[in-house]
Amino acid sequence: MDAPLVNESVEFQESQESLSLLEASKQLDLKKIQNLVDQGAVTSAIDIESGKNALHFIASYAEKETEVQAIEVTKWILSNGGVWNGIDRANETPGCIARRRNLLRLYETIVDAGVRSELLLSLLERKELTNEQLDTNEKYLQSALSYTQPTEDSSSLLDSDANAVMMSWERKIMHRSAEIIAPTKGRRVLNVGFGLGIIDTFLQEKEPSLHVIIEPHPDVLKHMRKNGWMDRENVIVYETTWENAINDIASKYVFDGIYYDAFAESYEDLRNFFDSVVGLLDPETDSKFSFFNGLGADNQTFYDVYKKLVPIDLVSFGLQCTYESMPVSSKDEEWKGAKRRYWDVSKYFLPIVTFDF
C-alpha cells in the first residue's frame, strides 16, 4: 500500500535574507528569524549544499539544555510556512535528526505538525480522487507480476517496475494479524489483497466458516487457481477491486475479522475503506479489523505521523484503534531484485481496530 508524504522544499538561489534565516536557525534566534521574515526571508528556504531547511538546522544545533527554546522556534517556523517533511542530502527529515540526537520532545513537536498538515491535506484532497491515483491503480492491474525467490528461504511478488508487492519477511506480521482477527476457529473473515497468500494461509488454519478474498490482479488470480484456492471449502474469491466488490459483499455477509493489504493504493483509499468496515464488521461479536501498516514505513518520522493520524481518522467512523508493537527485520539479500525498500523501520505497529462503544 503506497502512502507518499509530500516532502518538497523550495530549492532555488535563496535571497540573502533567507540564507541569513538559515544561520539564525542554527543559533535558535527567534527574534532575528522573525525580523528576517519581515524583510522577505522565506521559512521554507534550503541550503543548496546540504539540502537542509531551517528545521533541519534547529534539530542539528539544539542541545538538551536548549530543547525548549528549539521547540519554540520550531513551532513559530511551522506556523509560518516551514516544511516539516523536507528531506536533506543525507535523506533525513528534521524529525529524523531530532530523533537521532535524542531530542524526543522536539521530535514529537515535528511529528504532531506532520499530523496536522496531513489532516488538512487529506481534507483538501478528499473532494475528488485524482486522475494520478486512478492511473496508478490501472497501471498496476495491467502490469505483469512475477513471483521470485531472492534467497533459498524467501519469496517476493514484484510488479513490472520491480516494485515489491509483497515479501515473505512479512510472515511474522501476517501470522500475528491472523491471530488478532481470527482468534478462534469458525470465524467469518474477509481479506483484501491476496499477494503471496501469507495471511490467507494462516486464516485457513483457523478453519473459518466463511473466507472471502478480494483480489483484482490477473496474475495473482492465475497463481491462486494453480494452487487450488478457488476450490477450497468456504472460500469465496471476488476477482475484482474492493471498490467494485464491496456493495455485493455487504449485501450478503458480515464478518468477525477483516484485513486490508491492497497494493498501489494510497492512504486516502485506505481511509475510504474505513467507511466500508463499519458496514462489514459484525457489531454483535468481538469483531476486529486490521491492515498492513506500511504507511510511510521507509522513514521513521513519516511512520510515526501515520501512526497518530490513523486513530484520529477512524474516530469519525465510530471506530477506535490501538497498536501492538513487534520488532521486525529483513535481510538485505531478501530485497534482491526489488527497486526500493518500502520498509526501513525496526518496529512494526500492528493496528487493532474495533467499534468505539
From Swiss-Prot:
InterPro entries: Ankyrin_rpt-contain_sf, Arginine_N-MeTrfase_2, RMT2/GAMT_Mtase, RMT2_dom, SAM-dependent_MTases_sf. The keyword Transmembrane helix does not apply. One of its GO terms (biological process) is methylation. GO terms for molecular function: protein arginine N5-methyltransferase activity. S-adenosyl-L-methionine binds at Y140, M174, F194, G195, L196, G197, I198, I199, E215, P216, H217, W242, E243, D261. Residues 130-357 form the RMT2 domain. Its EC number is 2.1.1.-. It is an enzyme of class 2 (transferase). CDD domains: AdoMet_MTases (cd02440). One of its GO terms (cellular component) is nucleus. Keywords: Cytoplasm, Methyltransferase, Nucleus, S-adenosyl-L-methionine, Transferase. It is found in: Cytoplasm; Nucleus. Its main location: cytoplasm. S-adenosyl-L-methionine-dependent protein-arginine N-methyltransferase that methylates the delta-nitrogen atom of arginine residues to form N5-methylarginine (type IV) in target proteins. Monomethylates ribosomal protein L12. Belongs to the class I-like SAM-binding methyltransferase superfamily. RMT2 methyltransferase family. Monomer. This is Protein arginine N-methyltransferase 2.
